């Protein structure tokens, strides 16, 4: 039986139960609010983070795990006889995967580092598939890598930003453009493509957001195998989207998750995202 350890980072949004069930090692990105650093695993819940973020004038800062954290994890599991498959969010959004690559070069053993091209549950799709195959003990790292690449190629991720405040604070939207967008009640819908967030469209009401997003589901030519929803205090949109998506897709379960603080930092209050993969 092969011993393969799956390692990922916290932006995948795995629950503690998922990580425990599938024996996945999660390395945490941290967030800094008003000079204080928080580890989302031990120091602050996603809900508490949203409250703190609303209270601060400055955009919280996120930091990738230190290279030393990767080295420590890689040394631990290679010493126990594991091969390692380390799956991380797109390098277009964070330097996490590059830190993992540097650490892998410093540790002897069979360590494969993967840029999954996604984040949030789009990343989790690949991580959970890898962990399921690793736990079976019948597959090589190469076979698992090929399987998650297949899921990657069949995945789509969309995010709805209902307030431009955090994008303005982060310098991603000009202040005048953001001010006008707020006046016009503009909601931004973006798509993650090849690891890069790109504008899909802009609409002017939550009703039009819901209509547009549901049309994306309706117009998907292939059968949707898994559809997950993530929100940052965006339950109104998320709940309506889930209810109607069940009717469209025939899926009986569409899981809903609270966004990881790193994701919420950039998406802002009220955001929600949905991601799926097809057959």
Swiss-Prot record:
Return the protein name.
DegV domain-containing protein lin1977
Q: What InterPro entries does the annotation carry? A: DegV, DegV_C, DegV_domain_contain
User: What is the superkingdom listed in this entry's lineage?
Assistant: Bacteria
Give the record's keywords alphabetically: Lipid-binding
The protein's job, in short, is:
May bind long-chain fatty acids, such as palmitate, and may play a role in lipid transport or fatty acid metabolism.
Q: Name one GO molecular function term.
A: lipid binding
Gene3D superfamilies in UniProt: 3.30.1180.10, 3.40.50.10170
Residue positions annotated to bind hexadecanoate are 62, 94
Task: List residues of the DegV domain.
Answer: 4-278
* PROSITE patterns documented for this protein: DEGV (PS51482)
């Amino acid at each position: 039986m092969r011993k393969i350890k799956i390692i990922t980072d916290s932006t995948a949004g795995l629950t503690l139960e998922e990580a425990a069930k599938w024996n996945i090692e999660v390395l945490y990105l941290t967030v800094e609010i008003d000079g204080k650093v928080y580890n989302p695993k031990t120091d602050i819940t996603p809900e508490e983070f949203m409250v703190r973020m609303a209270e601060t004038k400055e955009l919280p800062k996120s930091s990738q795990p230190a290279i030393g954290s990767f080295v420590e994890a890689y040394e631990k599991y290679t010493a126990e006889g594991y091969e390692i498959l380390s799956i991380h969010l797109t390098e277009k959004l964070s330097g996490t995967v590059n830190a993992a690559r540097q650490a892998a070069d410093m540790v002897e053993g069979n360590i494969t580092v993967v840029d999954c091209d996604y984040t949030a549950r789009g990343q989790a799709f690949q991580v959970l598939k890898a962990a399921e195959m690793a736990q079976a003990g019948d597959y090589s790292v190469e076979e698992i890598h090929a399987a998650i690449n297949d899921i990657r190629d069949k995945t789509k991720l969309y995010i709805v930003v209902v307030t431009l405040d955090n994008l303005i604070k982060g310098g991603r939207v000009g202040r005048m453009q953001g001010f006008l967008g707020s006046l016009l009640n503009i909601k931004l819908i973006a798509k993650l493509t090849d690891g890069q967030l790109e504008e899909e469209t802009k609409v002017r009401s939550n009703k039009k957001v819901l209509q547009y997003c549901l049309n994306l589901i309706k117009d998907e030519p292939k059968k949707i195998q898994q559809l997950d929803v993530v929100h940052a205090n965006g339950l109104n949109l998320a709940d309506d989207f889930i209810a109607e998506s069940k009717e469209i897709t025939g899926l009986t379960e569409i899981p809903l998750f609270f966004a990881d603080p790193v994701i919420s930092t950039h998406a802002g209050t009220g955001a929600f995202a949905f991601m799926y993969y097809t057959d």
